[in-house]
């Protein structure tokens, strides 16, 4: 959980002074016990910090402003122990710039039927206070997640955990800098978009970075540094030397290691956590020059390994997917099955098991590999460098997962997710690349059709662990459209949803 160890979620309890000082003391004691219990549950990956009971508008405003100014705080949980008049929350909610979760719960699980009296009723008014708080949030159009359930319930805790991971991802997104090594692939529409609006709405900052400057880093990487990294490769991967021959194999692997070192150093020096490449922009040097120094191949191996470390990646200049993958990686830290950048490549029509092969030229993250990846070198005839090229080769784990993408529709961004089932492919002896084979849900015909109708991309950020609930929370926190495709999708209902959304997102701006 290293990604979360320096982060906090603040818990603010709502009450009022109407019920006297003794009630406030009890509210405070109960709140501390509940926060300690949630932290001890092991279900919530980010530490919850109790920030006291708010009994007035000034107290609410003070804690919300403090949350905004504390980089450790990624979100606020509110709970109304007693009745807390909602007008006292207006200024604080207007100030709040962090994600909000409203927890509708209660200190006691059951009503003490034999002893209940008006003192108990006045103190334990979550049923009353939370509805009042919910009303003002709805009236103010405050985006928030509402979790209803007993605080010791594992189901409620897991919903909080989802929100907490997403809040961490959103906080990270506001600090992401994505470097484009080269621009978007010419004439491709879906990987392009409005980078200014992207930063304004989602927080990601995208910059062009000259490949010539990257080459300056490459030239400074020593043979000794590259050889040291190659030794690491030997420990992690199965070495498989095929038609390239041993001399070419190790030369290409060594140069791939240099590319990885150079890329990592640039990203670190520039404070970047995401990047894109373009196979047609790998430097201007002539590879046939006897004194050539530079990228002699697409930096696919480097991209695969950097993705595993948490750097966002997008091929062909796809900065939206690079940024989204970074957020996906942050959200799923500590989860078991992994995530990757993937691309729809070719179809396999086989009745109920009709599927789409996911691959790329090289750049698939080994986190999703079912077995130990093989380090191979093969000819790649795409792009400016048509050369023998190093890459990790594997097939993905089987099982259900979610692919996600963000598209620019001109007047707004749309987040799309789709449930898929990764299945085992047949052997592909002449396709030495990493791959996944999946069946879109609910069927190929409906799933693929809905994705196309939504304007989905051919690139996606995929995870076995991150569910629709995460992406729904993510879109809500950022105020962007979200549509999901799953086992319950029908084309007619999905088309109607898209039509309604067109009107809603046009008119919704007038409500804020």
Residue ranges of model-derived segments:
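Short beta-strand segments enriched in small/hydrophobic residues
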Residues: 2-26, 175-184
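Flexible loop/turn segments at secondary-structure boundaries
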Residues: 18-20, 57-58, 84-87, 109-110, ...
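Short catalytic helix/loop segments, enriched in acidic residues and glycine
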Residues: 25-41
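Short, well-structured alpha-helical segments in soluble
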Residues: 60-73, 90-92, 260-269
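Structural motif
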Residues: 52-66, 156
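A short helix->loop->beta-strand "cap" motif at the edges of active sites that frequently abuts
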Residues: 96-100, 142
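Cap/lid and interdomain-hinge subdomains that line or gate substrate/regulatory clefts
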Residues: 45-48, 104, 109-244, 248
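Anaerobic metallocofactor- and corrinoid-dependent redox/one-carbon enzyme cores
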Residues: 81, 98, 104, 112-113, ...
